[in-house]
Amino acid sequence: MIAIVNYDTGNIRSVTNALARVGCTEWIYTDDKALLAQADKVILPGVGEASTAMAKLAERGLDTFIPTLTQPVLGICVGTQLMCQSSEEGDVECMGIFRTQVRRFQNNGEPGAAPMKIPHMGWNQITDLRTPLFKGIDEGAYIYYVHSYYPVLCADTIATSHYINGFSGALGRDNFFGTQFHPEKSGAIGAQIIKNFLEL
């Protein structure tokens, strides 16, 4: 059974549609700790503002519970950011699973060039792929992003992307994984990544 964390933040429909596309139809949407602990895999989706999302996790006691899970856990977008140490968005302390901070893109642009748009929105490449999460994925594969904040490159980086500067496209530590990009919106590549996660 796949458990999707319910904390009133996240695009549940796009995630469940993506699960269905890879043949997964058994899932629950819950904030119940017992059900989360019993699940085979846990997905932490997220959209919106990091400090608000952390507050919603804390209201449910999930900010301290999620780091204790021992099965594979996948964060998506803001869900991944909440698994880092802290975020500049709302200046908030996060769960501290991944040993890095979340920063805002600085819209400086290259010297002599027009500033780049923020948020970073659209298709971009992932490189330096590590861990079985990316089994069958080619270096330089294109995935879909929508974000203004990013996890800084660190020892837990398992995929790298570049927009204005290099950043962690995905993170992994022990049984925890997180994608700054949206695998559920990344076509066949994203479907393979989700399938890989379900097979961990």
Language model region names:
Residues T68, V102-L200:
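Amide-donor transfer/coupling interface in amidating biosynthetic enzymes
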Residues I2-C24, E184-K185:
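N-terminal beta1-alpha1 ligand-phosphate binding loop
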Residues L19-E26, A50-K56, M121-T127:
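Short, flexible loop segments at the rims of nucleotide/cofactor-binding pockets, characterized by
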Residues M1, W27-Q38:
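Short acidic low-complexity segments
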